[in-house]
Amino acid sequence: MTNIRKKHPLLKIINDSFIDLPAPSNISSWWNFGSLLGICLVIQILTGLFLAMHYTSDTSTAFSSVTHICRDVNYGWLIRYMHANGASMFFICLFLHVGRGMYYGSYTFMETWNIGVILVFAVMATAXMGXVLPWGQMSFWGATVITNLLSAIPYIGTTLVEWIWGGFSVDKATLTRFFAFHFILPFIITALVVVHLLFLHETGSNNPSGLNSDADKIPFHPYYTIKDILGIILLLMVLMILVLFFPDILGDPDNYTPANPLNTPAHIKPEWYFLFAYAILRSIPNKLGGVVALILSILILAILPLLHTSKQRGLTFRPITQTLFWILVANLFILTWIGGQPVEHPFILIGQLASISYFTIIIILMPAAGMIENNLLKFTH
């Protein structure tokens, strides 16, 4: 008799996705971040659900409802800080996952990659709205600055911003709708994740060599289930160290001051995971130009397949492009640092140079290096 997991309509899908799935025998720990992102999403949805049970999305009570969660709700402080720091862990895993895809040429799975780019935008939108909900100073002014960027759109900009605000400034209507969107988006993300995996399972996983691995597959369970569990344990350890010992290290102290439209904080800046994009936005003196650069800084991921010039898939055997890749990583760290600095000399210049470098490396240098490597290896025909 065949096992029920291979026959049952629902269990069969789970079986073919997580148990009997043929996986390459040589995928490294860089392939762990997909499952870690799944765990992050589950943690965020569960902690978020429990927070939503006690949170009120009205400007007069939002700040005090978060205080109430931390002080009066059983383990409310734990749920709140797991949710806040869980977002940071989510983005760390997201950046590493995307970086892995860039390094090993996973973007050649076009459908999977494009859904992934949409997921990056969806997760960023969710996080941006989540940071508004506690209704502290940085919540209010962050929401004001970010929504105001849309006013740079010619002709319809101002109308669009006021439509999103639900009035002439960030106020009650804005907070309520941001809570609604922040609640619904993770479920849309979950649906997109299913589509992401659906497309991935059409082709099978990439692997560090970049070669076809059909000749050497192993079952996902037990080999990669146990490997994923190790990754999950490490992720939870890091998350709990953050939550229990340094819960506010990644937050902004200004957000412990209730929102006040009459008092602007000295330095308005987003959460750390948006700082690189914020630095690119600020590096262009023109408002519309900055917004375009901001969007392109993420959207550029979508054109990576078009910029691939090498005859090889990944960077495993390509030292020149490898060097450029790690310079790009260092450049992103510089942008992140600049995004958190005030707009003054020398930070303005450093930010502009780092922004130019970011686009130059991806659009010009890496494709050129790919062609050079083809010639060096005589892969010319």
UniProtKB/Swiss-Prot annotation:
PROSITE patterns: CYTB_CTER, CYTB_NTER. The chain crosses the membrane at residues 33-53, 77-98, 113-133, 178-198, 226-246, 288-308, 320-340, 347-367. Heme b b566 binds at residues 97, 196. It is found in: Mitochondrion inner membrane. The keyword Iron applies. It holds the Pfam family Cytochrome_B. InterPro entries: Cyt_b/b6_C, Cyt_b/b6_C_sf, Cyt_b/b6_N, Cytb/b6-like_sf, Cytochrome_b, Cytochrome_b_C_euk/bac, Cytochrome_b_N_euk/bac, Di-haem_cyt_TM. Its main location: mitochondrion. GO terms for cellular component: mitochondrial inner membrane; respiratory chain complex III. It is a multi-pass membrane protein. GO terms for molecular function: metal ion binding; ubiquinol-cytochrome-c reductase activity. Keywords: Electron transport, Heme, Iron, Membrane, Metal-binding, Mitochondrion, Mitochondrion inner membrane, Respiratory chain, Transmembrane, Transmembrane helix, Transport, Ubiquinone. One of its GO terms (biological process) is mitochondrial electron transport, ubiquinol to cytochrome c. It comes from the Eukaryota. SUPFAM superfamilies: a domain/subunit of cytochrome bc1 complex (Ubiquinol-cytochrome c reductase), Transmembrane di-heme cytochromes. Heme b b562 binds at residues 83, 182. The cytochrome bc1 complex contains 11 subunits: 3 respiratory subunits (MT-CYB, CYC1 and UQCRFS1), 2 core proteins (UQCRC1 and UQCRC2) and 6 low-molecular weight proteins (UQCRH/QCR6, UQCRB/QCR7, UQCRQ/QCR8, UQCR10/QCR9, UQCR11/QCR10 and a cleavage product of UQCRFS1). This cytochrome bc1 complex then forms a dimer. Component of the ubiquinol-cytochrome c reductase complex (complex III or cytochrome b-c1 complex) that is part of the mitochondrial respiratory chain. The b-c1 complex mediates electron transfer from ubiquinol to cytochrome c. Contributes to the generation of a proton gradient across the mitochondrial membrane that is then used for ATP synthesis. Heme 1 (or BL or b562) is low-potential and absorbs at about 562 nm, and heme 2 (or BH or b566) is high-potential and absorbs at about 566 nm. Belongs to the cytochrome b family. This is Cytochrome b. The gene is MT-CYB.
